[in-house]
Amino acid sequence: MPKRILQGTVTSDKNEQTVTVLVERRFKHPLLKKTVRLSKKYRAHDPENQFKVGDIVRIEECAPISKTKRWKVVTDAVVA
Protein backbone atom coordinates (compact mmCIF):
# COMPACT_ATOMS: atom_id res chain seq x y z
CA MET A 1 0.00 0.00 0.00
CA PRO A 2 1.47 3.41 -0.96
CA LYS A 3 2.16 6.02 1.68
CA ARG A 4 -0.28 8.91 1.88
CA ILE A 5 1.08 12.40 1.18
CA LEU A 6 -0.81 15.47 2.41
CA GLN A 7 -0.23 19.20 2.04
CA GLY A 8 -0.85 21.71 4.79
CA THR A 9 0.27 24.77 6.73
CA VAL A 10 2.55 24.69 9.78
CA THR A 11 0.60 26.07 12.76
CA SER A 12 3.10 25.36 15.56
CA ASP A 13 6.85 24.74 15.79
CA LYS A 14 7.34 25.06 19.54
CA ASN A 15 8.29 21.42 20.18
CA GLU A 16 11.75 20.03 19.46
CA GLN A 17 11.82 18.15 16.11
CA THR A 18 8.03 18.38 15.79
CA VAL A 19 5.68 20.63 13.84
CA THR A 20 1.89 20.73 13.86
CA VAL A 21 0.43 20.83 10.34
CA LEU A 22 -3.14 21.90 9.56
CA VAL A 23 -4.50 20.00 6.54
CA GLU A 24 -7.69 21.28 4.94
CA ARG A 25 -9.98 19.02 2.93
CA ARG A 26 -12.75 20.28 0.62
CA PHE A 27 -15.55 18.22 -0.85
CA LYS A 28 -19.06 18.66 -2.14
CA HIS A 29 -21.77 17.47 0.26
CA PRO A 30 -23.70 14.66 -1.48
CA LEU A 31 -27.16 15.81 -0.38
CA LEU A 32 -26.83 19.58 0.00
CA LYS A 33 -24.48 20.08 -3.01
CA LYS A 34 -22.56 22.62 -0.97
CA THR A 35 -18.76 22.79 -0.71
CA VAL A 36 -17.70 21.75 2.80
CA ARG A 37 -14.33 22.56 4.38
CA LEU A 38 -12.95 20.16 6.99
CA SER A 39 -9.56 20.58 8.64
CA LYS A 40 -7.44 18.30 10.78
CA LYS A 41 -4.14 18.80 12.61
CA TYR A 42 -1.29 16.31 12.27
CA ARG A 43 1.93 16.23 14.28
CA ALA A 44 4.88 15.63 11.97
CA HIS A 45 8.58 14.88 12.49
CA ASP A 46 10.95 17.72 11.52
CA PRO A 47 14.46 16.48 12.47
CA GLU A 48 16.34 19.72 11.63
CA ASN A 49 13.72 22.19 12.95
CA GLN A 50 13.80 23.96 9.59
CA PHE A 51 10.08 24.72 9.14
CA LYS A 52 8.44 27.72 10.80
CA VAL A 53 4.84 28.82 11.42
CA GLY A 54 3.08 29.70 8.16
CA ASP A 55 5.20 27.46 5.90
CA ILE A 56 3.30 25.29 3.43
CA VAL A 57 4.70 21.75 3.61
CA ARG A 58 4.06 18.21 2.42
CA ILE A 59 3.88 15.42 4.99
CA GLU A 60 4.22 11.69 4.38
CA GLU A 61 2.93 8.76 6.39
CA CYS A 62 5.62 6.74 8.19
CA ALA A 63 6.13 4.23 10.99
CA PRO A 64 5.25 5.56 14.47
CA ILE A 65 7.97 7.88 15.80
CA SER A 66 6.29 8.62 19.14
CA LYS A 67 2.88 8.37 20.79
CA THR A 68 1.35 11.03 18.54
CA LYS A 69 3.70 11.28 15.53
CA ARG A 70 3.01 9.07 12.51
CA TRP A 71 3.95 11.59 9.80
CA LYS A 72 7.22 13.16 8.65
CA VAL A 73 7.78 16.40 6.76
CA VAL A 74 9.00 15.65 3.25
CA THR A 75 9.59 19.08 1.64
CA ASP A 76 8.28 22.57 1.17
CA ALA A 77 5.20 22.45 -1.01
CA VAL A 78 5.43 24.20 -4.35
CA VAL A 79 2.74 26.86 -4.36
CA ALA A 80 1.13 27.00 -7.79
From Swiss-Prot:
- Return one GO MF term: rRNA binding
**An example Gene Ontology biological process:** translation
Q: Does the keyword Lipid metabolism apply?
A: no
Q: What's in the GO CC field?
A: cytosolic small ribosomal subunit
The keyword Ion transport is assigned to this record: no
Pfam families (UniProt xref): Ribosomal_S17
Name the InterPro entries on file: NA-bd_OB-fold, Ribosomal_uS17, Ribosomal_uS17_bact/chlr
Record key words, sorted: Ribonucleoprotein, Ribosomal protein, RNA-binding, rRNA-binding
Record text on subunit structure and interactions: Part of the 30S ribosomal subunit.
- What is the purpose of this protein? One of the primary rRNA binding proteins, it binds specifically to the 5'-end of 16S ribosomal RNA.
**NCBIfam families found in the cross-reference section:** PRK05610.1 (NF004123), uS17_bact (TIGR03635)
Q: Which family does it belong to?
A: Belongs to the universal ribosomal protein uS17 family.
Q: What is this protein called?
A: Small ribosomal subunit protein uS17
Give the lineage.
Bacteria, Pseudomonadati, Pseudomonadota, Alphaproteobacteria, Rhodobacterales
